[in-house]
C-alpha cells in the first residue's frame, strides 16, 4: 500500500529571490533521491513561504523495488589457475560484490569466456530508506549561506524545525542542529507553533495558523484581491510580474490594500514615482482608465485585515518620505548646469586602474565618431552622436540619480531636454544603457545605438586592457552583458560592420588616458558572445563553422547560422557539405602566392569549376548565398572525379589548388564548411 511523505524545513526569513528557486530545487533533489533509491511515487508537490520549504510525495511505494544486477568479471583464463581452481583475481572480484565463488558462472562475449555473477538485492522498507533523506537537504545549494550560534556548519538561514511525516507517522531524523518532529511554526505574528497531523493535512494545519503554504495559491490570492480593488475603486493596477513574484515570497498570509498620497507629487516625473513605489517600497502602481498615474498605490500586507487602516497610514507615511526626496531632487537638479556637471566627472573614478569617467567619455566620443561613419548616419545624426558623447554621463552627479540610481539615463534625458538639448541627444543619453539585461529592450534610435555601442566597446576594451577579464562565472563588471549588448545591437540594426577590422582600428587609436591591450582576448570574448547569440537552435558544428568564417560581421554570421540550420534538414545538405569540405581541406595545401592560370587547364572540368567560382557573386540573403554555394556541389564533384588535384607536376598541382583556394575564399565568407558534421 502506498503512502504520502511530507518534508518541511522551517527556517529564519529567507531572501525573497531565493524562495522559489529553492522550492524547485528541493522537489527536484527529492525526486532524484527517491528514483536513485528505487522508491516509486506518483506525484511531487512543493510548497514555500519566506519561512519554510516543503515537499509532499504522493503515492510513495512501501518499499524499494528488488534489484537484480549482473556483474562482469575477469576472463576465464585469469579466473582459473592451472589446477582449475578459482584464482585470487576471481575470489577478489566476488568478494567485492559481497558474494562467494559459488555464484560464479561463465558467459561467452565475442568468443571469450568471462566470469559473471548475478546479485539479487531485496528492496528495503521505505521507512528505512528515508532515514537517509536528510542528504537531500544537505545537498541544497544557495547563492549565499551563513553561520549561526557557535556552529561550524552553514546554511542559507538558521534552521528552526524539521518535519518528516510518512502518512501520520513522524520519522526520527537529525539535520544540522535540529531533531525532527511534527511541530511547525505558524505566522510570525498571527499564529503559534502547531502540530502537523499528517502529510495530507499539511496545508490545512498551517492555514489555521495564517500560513498559506502553496505559493501558487498565495499568488492567486494577491491577484484576486488586487482585481477586487480595481473594480471597487474604478482603477487599473500595474501587476508587474517580477514585483508580484517578489511580493508573494515576502508574505505568508497576503492581504492587499490601497493607499494614497497627495496629488502634488504627480508633478514629479512618472519614472521617479514608479521607482519609489515599485523598486523601493514594493508597491503596485495605480492608474486611471486612461492609463494616467493616480495618487494611489496597492501594497500587500503579511497578515489579515485586522487594523488595516493603521497599516495603510504607515505605508503612506513611508512612501511620502520617498516622494518628498524625489520632489526635492527634481526641483534642485534643475538649477544645475550640464557643463558644470560634465566638468566634475574628471573627479569621478570609472575604475581605479582605468581612470575617470571623463576619460572614459573622451574615448567613447572617438569610438562613436568612427561607428557613426561605419553605420552611415546622416550629418544630423553624426552631430547628435558627438554632442551626446560629450555629456551623456552628466546625470550621475545629480541628486536624483544619487538617490535613485535606477534612474540613470532616464533622468539624463529629462534634464537634457529641460536644458534645451536636441531631442535625439537627450534620447541617446537614456538609450546608451540599453540593453540593461539579457533579452532587455534595445535602443530604438540610431544615435542611441551608436552611443551604446561606443560606450560598451570602450568599457570592454578598457577592462581587458588592464587585465580585468571575466573568468568562469565571475564577471563583476558585467562585461558579458555589455558584449552581448554589442552583438544584439549590431544584429538589430543590421549594421554590417566587420568586428575584426573595427577592433583593429580601435587598437590603432592613441589616448593619453589608456592604451588598449589584449586584443586577441577581446576578439575571442566577442566571438563567444556571438556563439551564445546563435543559441541552442544551432548545433555546435554549425556555430563553430560560422565563427571560423572569414567575415566577422555579426548580422551576417547570425543569418548564416540560421540558414545552415534550415539547410541541414534538406536532402542536398550532406552531399553539398561533403564536397565543399573536401575542397576546403585540400585548399589548405595551396600556395597563397599562386594565381589561377587558365592556360594550365588540362580538362573541361577545371575550366567549368573556375568559371563557376568567378561567377559566384553571393548576393541576397544568407539562405540565398548558401543556395548559390551548394549549387556548385555537382561541379565540384565533377572536378574531383576527373582531375588529379595533387598531380606530380608541381605547376598543375599548384594551379588546381589555387582553383580550390578561390572557391574557399568566397564560400568561407559564409562558413568554414569543413567544420560541419554530416554523420
UniProtKB/Swiss-Prot annotation:
One of its GO terms (biological process) is glycyl-tRNA aminoacylation. One of its GO terms (cellular component) is cytosol. It comes from the Bacteria. Pfam families: tRNA_synt_2f. It catalyses: tRNA(Gly) + glycine + ATP = glycyl-tRNA(Gly) + AMP + diphosphate. Keywords: Aminoacyl-tRNA synthetase, ATP-binding, Cytoplasm, Ligase, Nucleotide-binding, Protein biosynthesis. Its main location: cytoplasm. Its EC number is 6.1.1.14. Coiled coil: none annotated. InterPro entries: Gly-tRNA-synth_bsu, Gly-tRNA-synth_heterodimer. It is an enzyme of class 6 (ligase). It is found in: Cytoplasm. GO terms for molecular function: ATP binding; glycine-tRNA ligase activity. Belongs to the class-II aminoacyl-tRNA synthetase family. Tetramer of two alpha and two beta subunits. PANTHER family: GLYCINE--TRNA LIGASE, CHLOROPLASTIC_MITOCHONDRIAL 2, GLYCYL-TRNA SYNTHETASE. This is Glycine--tRNA ligase beta subunit. It comes from Streptococcus pyogenes serotype M49 (strain NZ131). The gene is glyS.
Amino acid at each position: 500500500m502506498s503512502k504520502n511523505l511530507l518534508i518541511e524545513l522551517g527556517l529564519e526569513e529567507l531572501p525573497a529571490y531565493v524562495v522559489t528557486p529553492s522550492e524547485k530545487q528541493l522537489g527536484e533533489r527529492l525526486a532524484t533521491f527517491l528514483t536513485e533509491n528505487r522508491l516509486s511515487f506518483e506525484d511531487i508537490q512543493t510548497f514555500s513561504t519566506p519561512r519554510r520549504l516543503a515537499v509532499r510525495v504522493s503515492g510513495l511505494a512501501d518499499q524499494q523495488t528488488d534489484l537484480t544486477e549482473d556483474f562482469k568479471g575477469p576472463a576465464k583464463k585469469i579466473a582459473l589457475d592451472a589446477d582449475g581452481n578459482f584464482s585470487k583475481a576471481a575470489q577478489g572480484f566476488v568478494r567485492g560484490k559481497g558474494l562467494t565463488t559459488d555464484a560464479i558462472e561463465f558467459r561467452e562475449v565475442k568468443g571469450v569466456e568471462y566470469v559473471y555473477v548475478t546479485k539479487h538485492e531485496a528492496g528495503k522498507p521505505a521507512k528505512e530508506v528515508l532515514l537517509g533523506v536528510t542528504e537531500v537537504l544537505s545537498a541544497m545549494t544557495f547563492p549565499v549561506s551563513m553561520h549561526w550560534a557557535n556552529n561550524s556548519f552553514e546554511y542559507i538561514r538558521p534552521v528552526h524545525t524539521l518535519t518528516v511525516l510518512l502518512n501520520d507517522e513522524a520519522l526520527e531524523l537529525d539535520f544540522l542542529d535540529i531533531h525532527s518532529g511534527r511541530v511547525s511554526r505558524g505566522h510570525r505574528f498571527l499564529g503559534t507553533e502547531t502540530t502537523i497531523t499528517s502529510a495530507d493535512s499539511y496545508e490545512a494545519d498551517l492555514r489555521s495558523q495564517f500560513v498559506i503554504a502553496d505559493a501558487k495559491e498565495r499568488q492567486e490570492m494577491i491577484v484576486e484581491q488586487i482585481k477586487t480593488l480595481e473594480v471597487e475603486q474604478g482603477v487599473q493596477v500595474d501587476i508587474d510580474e517580477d514585483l508580484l513574484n517578489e511580493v508573494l515570497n515576502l508574505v505568508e498570509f497576503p492581504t492587499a490594500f490601497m493607499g494614497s498620497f497627495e496629488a502634488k507629487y504627480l508633478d514629479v516625473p512618472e519614472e521617479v514615482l514608479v521607482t519609489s513605489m515599485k523598486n523601493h517600497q514594493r508597491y503596485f502602481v495605480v492608474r486611471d482608465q486612461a492609463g494616467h498615474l493616480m495618487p494611489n498605490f496597492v501594497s500587500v500586507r503579511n497578515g489579515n485585515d485586522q487594523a488595516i487602516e493603521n497599516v495603510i497610514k504607515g505605508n503612506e507615511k513611508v512612501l511620502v518620505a520617498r516622494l518628498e526626496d524625489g520632489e526635492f531632487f527634481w526641483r534642485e537638479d534643475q538649477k544645475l548646469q550640464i557643463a558644470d556637471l560634465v566638468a566634475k566627472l574628471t573627479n569621478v573614478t570609472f575604475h581605479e586602474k582605468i581612470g575617470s569617467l571623463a576619460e572614459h567619455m573622451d574615448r567613447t566620443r572617438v569610438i562613436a565618431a568612427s561607428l557613426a561613419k561605419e553605420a552611415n548616419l546622416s550629418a544630423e545624426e553624426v552631430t547628435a552622436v558627438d554632442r551626446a558623447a560629450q555629456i551623456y554621463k552628466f546625470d550621475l552627479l545629480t541628486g536624483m540619480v544619487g538617490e535613485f540610481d535606477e534612474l540613470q539615463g532616464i533622468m539624463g534625458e529629462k534634464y537634457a531636454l529641460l536644458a534645451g538639448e536636441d531631442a535625439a541627444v537627450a534620447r541617446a543619453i537614456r538609450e546608451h544603457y540599453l540593453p540593461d539585461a539579457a533579452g532587455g529592450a534595445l535602443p530604438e534610435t540610431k544615435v542611441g545605438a551608436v552611443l551604446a555601442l561606443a560606450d560598451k566597446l570602450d568599457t570592454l576594451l578598457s577592462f581587458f586592457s588592464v587585465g580585468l577579464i571575466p573568468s568562469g562565472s565571475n564577471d563583476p563588471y558585467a562585461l558579458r552583458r555589455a558584449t552581448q549588448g554589442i552583438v544584439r545591437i549590431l544584429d538589430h540594426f543590421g549594421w554590417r560592420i566587420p568586428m575584426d577590422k573595427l577592433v583593429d582600428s580601435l587598437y590603432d587609436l592613441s589616448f593619453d588616458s589608456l592604451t588598449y591591450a589584449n586584443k586577441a582576448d577581446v576578439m575571442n570574448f566577442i566571438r563567444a558572445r556571438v556563439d551564445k547569440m546563435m543559441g541552442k537552435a544551432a548545433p555546435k558544428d554549425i556555430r563553430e563553422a560560422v565563427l571560423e568564417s572569414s567575415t566577422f560581421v555579426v548580422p551576417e554570421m547570425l543569418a548564416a547560422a540560421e540558414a545552415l540550420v534550415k539547410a541541414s534538414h534538406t536532402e542536398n545538405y550532406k552531399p553539398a557539405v561533403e564536397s565543399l569540405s573536401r575542397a576546403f581541406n585540400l585548399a589548405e595545401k595551396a600556395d597563397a602566392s599562386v594565381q589561377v592560370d587558365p592556360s594550365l587547364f588540362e580538362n573541361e572540368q577545371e575550366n567549368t569549376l573556375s568559371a563557376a567560382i568567378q561567377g559566384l557573386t553571393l548576393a541576397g540573403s544568407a539562405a540565398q548565398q548558401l543556395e548559390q554555394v551548394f549549387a556548385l556541389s555537382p561541379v565540384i564533384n565533377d572536378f574531383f572525379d576527373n582531375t588529379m588535384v595533387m598531380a606530380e607536376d608541381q605547376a598543375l598541382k599548384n594551379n588546381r589548388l589555387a582553383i580550390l583556394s578561390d572557391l574557399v575564399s568566397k564560400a568561407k565568407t559564409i562558413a568554414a564548411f569543413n567544420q560541419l558534421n554530416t554523420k
